[in-house]
Amino acid sequence: MKNTYYITTPIYYVNDVSHIGHAYTSVASDVIARFMRCCGKDVMFLTGTDEHGQKVEKAAINKNIDPQSFTDKTSQNFRDLMVAMNISNDDFIRTTENRHKKAVAVFWQKLLDNGAIYEGFYEGWYSVRDEAFYDESEITEDKLAPTGAPVEWVKEPSYFFNLAKWQDKLLEFYELNPDFVRPISRRNEVISFVKSGLKDLSISRTTFNWGIKVPNNEKHVIYVWLDALVNYISALGYPDQQSNYSKFWPANLQVVGKDILRFHAVYWPAFLMAAEISPPKSIMVHGWWTNAGQKISKSLGNTIDPITLIDEFGVDQVRYFLMREVIFGADANFTRNNLITRINSELSNKIGNLLHRIVSFVYNNNDAKVPLIKSGVIDKIYELPILKTAMKFAQENILLMDKIEINKILENIINLAEDANIYIANEAPWNLKKTDYDKMLEVLYTLLEVLRYVAIMLQPFVPSSANKMLDQLGVAKEERLFKHLVRDHALKAGSNILEPSIIFPKI
């Protein structure tokens, strides 16, 4: 069984600056990538920017600059977001890069050689904002797409992809791969759409210039979504079989928002099948963040700047909130009050205060060392309910991540911290110092060990803060994987701890 794990975000469209929706997608994908690294997987994590299409060309014209200069600047906004959010992507693909253009040309030729592309004439509804074609039945009386985007009637020569031919093959694929689209509500949505009947898809445009030209026919620009979807393999070195392409494809998980589900769950696997390439193993679809109940979107002008939030609250605090506040796949409403409550109630009170109390007590009362207790006593400590809970959560969290139940993992970690707060209150080591010194050492060791579990499990979510916690506890850098959450890697009795510092200050 391959020990590799390939995860992608959608590549972000560069017609405006990044917002909290992009931050959420990126952090969720980053948490999964970091989690898999903590499981010992060889991870490839890709993100990037989608830089072609009519919408980008119009945005550049409106700013009176050429499209390449426009995309250079706006793509950098997304790179800056990745740095600000502490995103651990292994690569950042831009669709204006030569490596991508070459891969798209090869992919197009493969489709052409396999008889999946033919020339014709397109007449129908098109949304520039969505960069998507819509059927007459999907358009409202006000000439709006289902997304609320305006549409225009387009008439132009076009190349077509024979999508209708793949209807039965797609339905068979969904049947054989029940986890291809998750959650199940989105899977049902996709199956319903495909069963309603697929029509061949226009995959080139002639009414604008900013895009990858069709090989041997430069009057046509390749449809931006066909171009964009190929990024997931172009970044791996497709079609070179000696590259990361053969190592990592098919992707284990592709994370997308519900607004681009059709492109990823219908068009993308059909394109790949036609090119004789395996589809990704799973597509995980998340919901939208809302602001006063309205989708947060650059098109609607109600965005929340994640950089501003980071500057005010801290990167790990914002990351934690985004992952804790919502069930992955559902919509969530952003409020500052909820953000502050999560930070103060959970990060500061339940985890930060616990760490500071225990490390301070050990630092001041045990010569800054992990209590020197015997191996047999550590065995006894591992029989305590609180350590059994810690070990149970460590195993359970891996199963939860398989189902992408991210908020439940955090719930387990918070519950463990709450158990530790109850344990310290009940055992009162400050009293034991006077009455039973050996028992005090056992209690302190137990609490330090529980904190080791909490910190290691927190790493994918709040990486900087979790590593500071582990530094304070004296946990070696090479002993911070999930496989170390066992008795054999318990804190070494007598090892040094660092001077305590506040990691999660109260807001």
Swiss-Prot record:
Protein name: Methionine--tRNA ligase
Positions that bind ATP: K298
Subunit structure: Monomer.
Sequence motif: 'HIGH' region, positions: 12-22
GO cellular component: cytoplasm
Motif segment ('KMSKS' region): 295-299
NCBIfam families, per database record: metG, PRK12267.1
Family (UniProt): Belongs to the class-I aminoacyl-tRNA synthetase family. MetG type 2B subfamily.
Annotated gene: metG
GO biological process annotation, one example: methionyl-tRNA aminoacylation
Matching Pfam families: Anticodon_3, tRNA-synt_1g
GO molecular function, one term: methionine-tRNA ligase activity
Localization: Cytoplasm
SUPFAM superfamilies: Anticodon-binding domain of a subclass of class I aminoacyl-tRNA synthetases (SSF47323), Nucleotidylyl transferase (SSF52374)
Keyword line: Aminoacyl-tRNA synthetase, ATP-binding, Cytoplasm, Ligase, Nucleotide-binding, Protein biosynthesis
Chain's role: Is required not only for elongation of protein synthesis but also for the initiation of all mRNA translation through initiator tRNA(fMet) aminoacylation.
Reaction catalyzed: tRNA(Met) + L-methionine + ATP = L-methionyl-tRNA(Met) + AMP + diphosphate
EC number: 6.1.1.10
Keyword ATP-binding: yes
